[in-house]
Each structure stands twice: as C-alpha cells, then as structure tokens.
From Swiss-Prot:
Function noted in UniProt: Catalyzes the reversible transfer of the terminal phosphate group between ATP and AMP. Plays an important role in cellular energy homeostasis and in adenine nucleotide metabolism.
Protein name, per record: Adenylate kinase
Classification via Pfam families: ADK
One GO location term (cellular component): cytoplasm
InterPro entries according to UniProt: Adenyl_kin_sub (IPR006259), Adenylat/UMP-CMP_kin (IPR000850), Adenylat_kinase_CS (IPR033690), P-loop_NTPase (IPR027417)
Amino acid sequence: MIITIFGPPGSGKGTQSSLLIERYNLKLISVGDLLRNIISSGSELGKKIKDTVESGNLIQDGVICELLYDQLALMDDNFLFDGFPRNLNQAHFLTQILRERYNRDVDIVIELQLNDKVAIDRLKNRLVCLDCKSVYSTSSFKDDNNLVCTRCKSARLEKRIDDSDLSAIDRRIGEYHVQVKSLREYYRDKLLMIDANLNVDQVKQEIESKISCSLV
C-alpha cells in the first residue's frame, strides 16, 4: 500500500503518519525530517534550506524531488509520504517515479483539513522531541523547566525553527491554500478529506474508517 498525507502546518501530519505506519506496517518517508537532517548537518545546502524555512518560504521542487528520488531507491513499495506532494508539480513527479520504480501509483491520499486560527495556535505552542519526533503543546506541561518527552523520556524538546515567526507561519498557511486546490483535483478519485480540528484519537478513527471503506 502507498499512502500520502498532506495538510496545512499544524494539522498533525507527523502524528497521524506515525500512527498509520504502525497500523498498516508501512515505511515512513517524511520530507520534513529529510530537510531537518540536512539542516542539522551544517552543509552549504543545509544553510540555504535553513534560511528558506525560517523566512516561511517553500523549498524548491528540484531539491525536494531529488531527496525523494534518493530515498525511494532504498524502499520497497509499501510506504507513507508525510507532507508530500505539496503542489501539482511534485504530484506529477511522484506519479512518474512510482510508475518507473514500482509500476504503480499512490493508493490513498489523505488531506487533513484545519481551521487557520487553530493551525496558528497549535504552531505557536508546538514542541517537538528531537529524539523520537513526538509532538507536544506547551499547554501539556505545567512546568516549563521540566519538559520531558513522555514517549522516550528525552529532555530535548524544542520549537521548530519555522514555528518561531508569526509572519512566516501566515505565509506557509497561505501558500498551502494556494497549492492544495490543484492537488484536490489531481487526486480527486483517491482523496480522503479528514477533519483535523478534532483530537488525535478522533482523527485517527476517522482516517482508519475512511481507509477501510475505500479498500472495500
């Protein structure tokens, strides 16, 4: 099975992706994680990507597609794309590379739909565990001096660099709304629209229910 999941910033793509790969025994391909790994390497490309991300702009398609091309060379044909494709050009690339490598296409496309105000509130308060990638809200912790991941017990919880600037957040959300219209049309026969304003368990249940119906 090949699944792709996309949605605006703060919609819970990473959280739901983690649940989906466990539920359906899939490998995860996260564009965000790939980019963050390059940034943390301190390379020239990493510095350029860091500057782009901090300004709220999107990474060039060529960079994204090259990363995905290399990653797919290491995978079989059961995986989930977290946060990809982000525009129609990337969708065409994905269709082409899947047909070349596996003679197939994406089976299920999940769009997480989220109110803009909710997205902004989530992003302003988001913390991410640097070790296991679990996501938290600052409101989950009573003591700001005792931030510990409940999953892996790491104390390395930090804000993402692209969550620190409100104007950058607004640009990311605005760009998403521009690009998602063409993605909906391109994937209209495979698209599952999910209300991401709900809590994590409710979103998980809605996704699994709609996947079950689509596979009948």
